[in-house]
């Protein structure tokens, strides 16, 4: 099965009327997951997978995708600050290639630069303890990533319905 990575704007026609998206924040030790609502307007933190073996990680991710009728995955692409691709981008692309062999669902990349930093800053502002931040930062970062993609999808949909110059 070939890797099916699409630009976000090409995803819209493939989505069923009430299908959801899963957002993924891929780390070396954990995988943060978030879930859209059925109208694809709001991203909610879902869970954090402690990485063990790829097969177990993929099994859990795909089980959640089946459980929530997920149409596609939005995975954070960890670009360098200058926009270039580094080793973490290669690791993310390898993960997507491996996972795409197990599912027919498409993938979309979303620039995740500073997502974890933004979430951590918000948690610190809320006076969350270091332990609490560690427990939730990955799934919150996944929600941050997915919300950005959902907002973009909504904008594309709104502007497509208008006559723009």
From Swiss-Prot:
**Assigned protein family:** Belongs to the YqgF nuclease family.
GO MF, one annotated term: nuclease activity
Against Pfam families, the record matches this protein to: RuvX
Which leading EC class covers this enzyme? hydrolase
UniProt-recorded name of the protein: Putative pre-16S rRNA nuclease
Keyword Nucleotide-binding assigned: no
- Please state where this protein is localized: Cytoplasm
Q: What CDD domains does its record include? A: YqgF
EC number in record: 3.1.-.-
- Return the InterPro entries for the record: RNaseH-like_sf, YqgF, YqgF/RNaseH-like_dom, YqgF/RNaseH-like_dom_sf
Job description of the protein: Could be a nuclease involved in processing of the 5'-end of pre-16S rRNA.
